[in-house]
Design a protein with these regions (language model features):
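Substrate-agnostic recognition of the 12-TM MFS/MFS-like secondary transporter fold
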Residues: 32-33, 66-72, 126-197, 338-341, ...
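C-terminal ends and interior cores of transmembrane alpha-helices
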Residues: 97-121, 396-423
Length: 544
């Protein structure tokens, strides 16, 4: 086979085939996923606003990341609720959109109308309220989007002819791949907007920067609009499919079966509802009472409750599938639980390497585009290889992407800059180093989600999505805890001044950031690979 034919075959199997597999029914959940991706629109504003105006420590911010992650564990009762109210689940998208809009409006008020907002609550209090409202809104929408991905893959074509099992499996994998693609596509859109919005920002005065920050929060109100539009599109497509089936001469009985094939009567599972209620009361109680080691207690308690519910739920599966899905979930959990460096790395890049808002936007754009390319290129790899092999590859890639950050902390960029007449400087290295919030974790979720969409019992699809997503999302809480510990052991501080009085509240100290970066790199490489090795030696061995 010639090189040209090989390249043509590769492009066909990765890029063109993805386009061929696309169906209009995939679009409504994809719109909700895009809205979730676009949620990062305010991320760079957040980094600079927190750094310059909020006197919150790196450890506190990592801790806030923990609490912001807890609503994602609410996917359990919400997922089961979706199964119970399947035909009316779209209303939950409106609830989520309202919470997201409220969170955005609070931040807009905080930036543009600071004095008015401060007369009600402290700046830090408003920030915490906003930071906790948004994830609740996104989790509500995400649960519905997951359920919509199941509906997006029909069992028959528009003539009522049944698809083969293999065809349905391919459609589910494509739907889940496009779901991750949509989320990261949202990141790309965000980065493009930020690059444009922050053009020449370093030359602007403080008040002009504040004005741009506020404008970005106003633009972020497009997020709830997009997700709500997805619901209306789903209603339209359902009506159109019904008309096409009638036109094809499908009988009334078959028509009723096809249009309600996902509306299976589900009995309330009181273990799931009761366990979820215990979880919510437990989490809020510990948080409100300000118990010592609250985050650790909540994490351990949440893990035990979710594991108990998983044990109850997987009894619905055949024995072989039970062990396999547990092994798969554990491997993904460990991979996603590896700690990050915390906000100290971004502060160091701003203060010492002089990265500005526009350059951060450029970095996140490059990271997101490369991840999109990665998903397209690795789709055949993901379809043909086990999750164990995928996680090993992602761990190696993730740790390699941290090396430039470690190097730059120790002045590697000064050496390369002097060697190349200023060409390979800190910014050049940072562009190559796309590890900044790189969403590789999204890739690891695709095989698990596709497996659930295809194999979970029809009456518990949303519940399965929710329980296993809650478990893998708990890993992000473990990630936040790990980051908090690293930032408590090795303390990193940045300069902060009061927004109203301009009094300096704290000074910068990055002397211990290097140890944090080295620790993160080693953990990212070694721990997931060790977990894969242990699982593959046990009865939980996964070939999925």
């Amino acid at each position: 086979m010639s090189i040209t034919k090989s390249i043509g075959s590769f492009i066909d199997s990765t890029l063109i085939d993805l386009g061929r597999q696309f169906r209009w029914s995939y679009l409504p959940p994809l719109m909700i996923y895009v809205a979730a991706g676009v949620s990062g629109l305010t991320g760079i504003v957040g980094i600079f606003f927190i750094k310059d105006y909020l006197n919150l420590s790196a450890a506190f911010l990592a801790g806030l990341g923990f609490w912001a992650g807890i609503p994602w564990a609410l996917k359990m009762p919400l997922g089961h609720l979706v199964d119970l109210i399947w035909s009316r689940k779209n209303y939950l998208v409106f609830v989520g959109a309202a919470l997201i809009a409220l969170s955005i409006i609070i931040m807009y008020g905080l930036i543009i109308h600071t004095e008015t907002m401060v007369s009600v609550f402290k700046v830090e209090t408003w920030f915490i309220i906003s930071a906790l409202l948004a994830p609740v809104g996104y989790v509500v929408q995400d649960v519905v989007a997951d359920a919509m991905t199941v509906e997006a893959v029909p069992s028959t074509d528009d003539q009522g002819i049944k698809y083969s099992d293999q065809k349905i499996k391919i459609m589910h994998t494509t739907m889940q791949t496009l779901g991750r693609f949509a989320i990261i596509g949202g990141f790309v859109l965000v980065a493009l907007v930020n690059v444009f919005m922050f053009a020449g920002v370093s030359a602007l005065s403080e008040s002009e920067k504040i004005e741009i920050y506020g404008r970005i929060y106003l633009y972020a109100l497009i997020i709830p609009v997009v997700s709500v539009s997805g619901v209306f599109l789903a209603m339209y497509l359902k009506k159109r499919r019904l008309e096409q089936l009638i036109k094809s001469g499908v009988g009334d009985e078959e028509l009723n079966r096809l249009t309600t094939e996902f509306e299976v009567t589900t009995e309330p599972n009181w273990w799931i509802l009761g366990g979820s209620l215990v979880f919510v009361i437990f989490t809020l109680g510990i948080g409100i009472l300000k118990v010592p080691f609250a985050q650790e207690i909540v994490f351990l308690g949440s893990t035990l409750i979710i594991l108990f519910l998983m044990k109850k739920l997987i009894t619905e599966l055949p024995e072989k599938s039970r062990f396999m899905i547990v092994g798969t979930a554990i491997i993904i959990f460990v991979f996603r639980a590896m700690p990050g460096p915390g906000p100290g790395l971004s502060w160091f890049e701003i203060d010492v390497l002089n990265f500005d808002q526009q350059f951060f936007s450029t970095l996140s754009l490059i990271a997101s585009v490369l991840t999109l390319v990665g998903i397209v290129i690795f789709r055949p790899f993901m379809a043909k290889n086990s999750i164990a092999k995928i996680i090993v590859v992602l761990s190696i890639v993730g740790s390699i992407l941290f090396l430039p950050s470690v190097g730059m902390y120790y002045g590697f960029h000064n050496w390369t800059s002097s060697l190349t007449n200023g060409l390979v400087d800190a910014r050049f290295i940072a562009i190559v180093n796309t590890a900044l919030e790189s969403p590789l974790g999204q890739v690891s979720m695709i095989p698990l989600l596709a497996w659930i969409a295809k194999n979970a019992p029809a009456h518990l699809k949303a519940t399965f999505f929710a329980i296993f997503a809650s478990f893998t999302n708990l890993a992000l809480s473990a990630n936040a805890l790990g980051s908090k510990y690293l930032n408590e052991i090795f303390v990193v501080t940045r300069a902060v001044k009061d927004k109203v009085t301009n009094v300096i509240l704290s000074t910068a100290d990055y002397s211990e950031l290097g140890i944090i970066l080295i620790s993160v790199t080693l953990l990212t490489l070694l721990v997931p690979i060790l977990a894969v090795w242990l699982i593959q030696k046990s009865k939980f061995r996964t070939n999925e």
